[in-house]
């Protein structure tokens, strides 16, 4: 009875860790809460869905393609909208509202694409589809139970090596901590920001691609996960990549385990309050650690 909840908690926590890292990358570069971030998760969902239906690819094969599409979409959003608004003097509140508008536009685009697949390509489940069943299994657990945490660990390690062992990583850190001084030193801050936004969109889309093996999806799936993603990033300190990874694990696993335990002990009505669990975890943690988990990592 406990095993399925443990497995799903590992998957859920690892995927939210990936998503939270990406959201943190967008925040530390522009200081704007990106409420459109969940839509990049949906891009990964529909990339895997399309490639599965048309080419019979598993999400493991389509994940790198989803990474590229999500990364390019994220860069387009930054260069085509947010940077232009910022250069015209828009406030942080205006930029935040712009991300909300972009998210609504994305949902509309996904709806148009889903309708095309439904009526033009006869894919009747395009608006809302079940999880894919073509995952491999190992030691009695589905493959994503191993792939998701390994991917999170490798990406976190890769970012650590990039930021601490390479010249470009040092330039990234300088651009984030003091962009004005970085420009004086000759660092191309905009190039750094574009790279960070590419990674952020890529991580979101890749996690969305993996998500199709865990749960079903639809046009607003990514947007519906934004509460958990923000909770994980804030729990991690909002400006710490490593804190975001840990925060994602805590939020994802905590939501799964507490929801599952609540259903067993109290009944199915607990599901109605599932979205409140990540916020509760975040609030309790911040009462103890006001600066989030990042304060423990310094």
Segments (PLM) and residue ranges:
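Helix-loop-helix "hairpin" substructures at the membrane interface of multi-pass membrane proteins
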Residues: 138-218, 222, 241-247
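Transmembrane helix-bundle core of multi-pass membrane transporters
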Residues: 84, 93-165, 192, 264-275, ...
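Cytosolic-side transmembrane-helix boundaries in multi-pass membrane proteins
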Residues: 113, 177-184, 188-191, 262-298
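Membrane-interfacial amphipathic/re-entrant helices at transmembrane-helix boundaries
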Residues: 1-20, 47, 58-62, 88-93, ...
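Short loop segments and helix-boundary regions at transmembrane helix junctions
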Residues: 29-33, 72-120, 162-165, 223-224, ...
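Single transmembrane alpha-helix segments in multi-pass membrane proteins
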Residues: 2-53, 80-90, 94, 234-241
């Amino acid at each position: 009875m406990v095993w399925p909840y443990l497995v799903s908690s590992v998957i859920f926590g690892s995927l939210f860790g990936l998503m939270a890292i990406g959201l943190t990358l967008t925040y530390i570069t522009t200081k704007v809460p990106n409420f459109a971030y969940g839509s990049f998760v949906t891009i990964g969902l529909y990339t895997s869905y399309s490639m599965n239906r048309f080419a019979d690819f598993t999400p493991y094969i389509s994940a790198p393609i989803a990474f590229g599409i999500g990364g390019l979409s994220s860069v387009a959003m930054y260069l085509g909208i947010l940077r232009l608004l910022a250069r015209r003097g828009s406030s942080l509140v205006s930029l935040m509202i712009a991300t909300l508008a972009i998210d609504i536009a994305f949902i509309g685009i996904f709806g148009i694409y889903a309708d095309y697949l439904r009526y033009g390509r006869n894919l009747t489940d395009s608006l809302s589809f079940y999880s894919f069943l073509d995952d491999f299994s190992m030691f009695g657990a589905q493959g994503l139970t191993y792939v998701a945490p390994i991917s999170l660990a490798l990406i976190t390690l890769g970012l650590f090596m990039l930021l601490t062992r390479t010249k470009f990583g040092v330039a990234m850190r300088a651009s984030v901590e003091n962009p004005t001084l970085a420009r004086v030193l000759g660092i191309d801050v905009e190039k750094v920001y574009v790279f960070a936004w590419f990674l952020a969109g890529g991580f979101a889309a890749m996690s969305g691609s993996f998500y199709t093996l865990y749960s079903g999806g639809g046009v607003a799936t990514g947007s519906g996960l934004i509460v958990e993603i923000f909770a994980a990033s804030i729990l991690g300190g909002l400006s710490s990549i490593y804190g975001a990874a840990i925060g994602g694990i805590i939020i994802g696993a905590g939501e799964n385990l507490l929801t599952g335990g609540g259903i067993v002990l109290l009944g199915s009505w607990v599901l109605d309050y599932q979205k409140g669990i990540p916020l509760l975890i975040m609030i309790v943690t911040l009462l103890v650690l006001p600066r989030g988990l990042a304060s423990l990592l310094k």
